[in-house]
Amino acid sequence: MRKNGSRCLKRSKKRCASKRKPAFSIRDTASFVCSAPNKEEKSDMSLKLHIVLFEPEIPQNTGNIARTCACIGATLHLVEPLGFRPSERNLKRAGLDYWDDVKIVHHASTKAFLDEHSADNLYFFTGQAERSYAEVDYAGEVFLVFGRESRGIDPEILERFAARCVRIPMKEGLRSLNLSNAAAIGAYEALRQNGFSGLV
């Protein structure tokens, strides 16, 4: 009788153990793989995204960025002087038929733009920054600022706004990513943090 009783006890313990929730499961890893916040978390600070190009030189890049802005609902800011005419064929071709769906704001100079906007809303993308673009908490009205393809953002501006500078990590020894790719990377990180609100 004792042997049978001990067997029953062991079986009941096994059943209980099988019903217990494991301390860690594969599902739990989801929070480590992608930590995008719930949409409700930033509902009081809905993202208003702007992409700013300081004196862009290559029309195809600007056209591609305009298309990205149209697809994500961002405003595109073009800061003069531009390295091309607004009627440039390559500019229109790169943006395809998305031009009617993007809001574009022109600024006479970098000074005019900087005088008009608070530094608290600006993030300057440069390879000289120490902080990664992914370490920033993007909320509210956000301006992602990019410099010229050939020289980037002027050193005096980077020095003035050193605390607002971020970089996109890349392999050591190489100069930079393509401008339109960099703009898309920065924009989609801001959108990811806000649960891609408004997108499908």
Positions of predicted regions on the chain:
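Acidic/His-rich, metal-assisted hydrolase cores and their charged scaffolds
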Residues: 22
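Post-transcriptional modification and biogenesis factors for structured RNAs
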Residues: 5, 9-10, 19, 27-200
